[in-house]
Amino acid sequence: VTGMTGDGINDAPALRRADVGFAMGSGTQVAKDAGDIVILDNRLSSIVRAVLYGRTVFKSIRKFITLQLTMNFSAVGVTMICPFLGIDSPVTVVQMLWINLIMDTLGGLAFAGEPPLQAYMREPPKRRDESILNRYMVNEIALLGGATVAVCLLFLKHPLITSQFRATEGNLCLLTAFFALFIFSSVFNCFNARTDRLGLFAGLKKNPVFLGIMLAVLVIPVSYTHLRAHETLANL
């Protein structure tokens, strides 16, 4: 990848031929038109910051894709396997909407606040044809998704777990607890997706929005479940 900086008319051909042409804000209009990016503050250090923030955005996109595919893989896997185990519709339509709309949206907002790390600048440039979904992400999605499916199926079928819940029509108590388990596993997957080979809690202080969103994801469905349960008991 070749970058070229320039501010004069004679720099225009090189700015056009470079992979990325950086024209100075104080340069000629010809140079600005030929370049891909105009550096308004006329500082070469701005190029370094632009690369850093660009790599941070690229990392955040990959984190969100990892989270989304892991959650969808888990939900689809549980939904497809459960009928063979005698469990019908472990995830309702409303719950699936919560997973796909609320969790995905909040997950995207949480990753948007990820701080730029200087470690990103030590990585080699990305190839033009490099897929946004790399082998590490595929392995992570398969491992975490498979583990989530296994834990969910164990929760739904193991006698030591199912015996802890009151027998109701349609196993409502068990399935409600199962949905809470799925939410907790989704939050864990959020923490795991954001670290990318780092410690699970690395850099959390630099992204307080992430902690707030994860707390809301946990509190809202659990609180709603308890409120609905108390309302149902009051009407009996």
What are the roles of these predicted feature ranges?
Residues 189, 209-222:
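Hydrophobic alpha-helical membrane segments
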Residues 203-209:
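Cytoplasmic-side transmembrane-helix entry/capping segments in multi-pass membrane proteins
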Residues 15, 233-236:
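Generic leucine side-chain signal with a strong bias for well-ordered alpha-helical environments
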Residues 1-3, 18, 25-197:
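Membrane-embedded transport module
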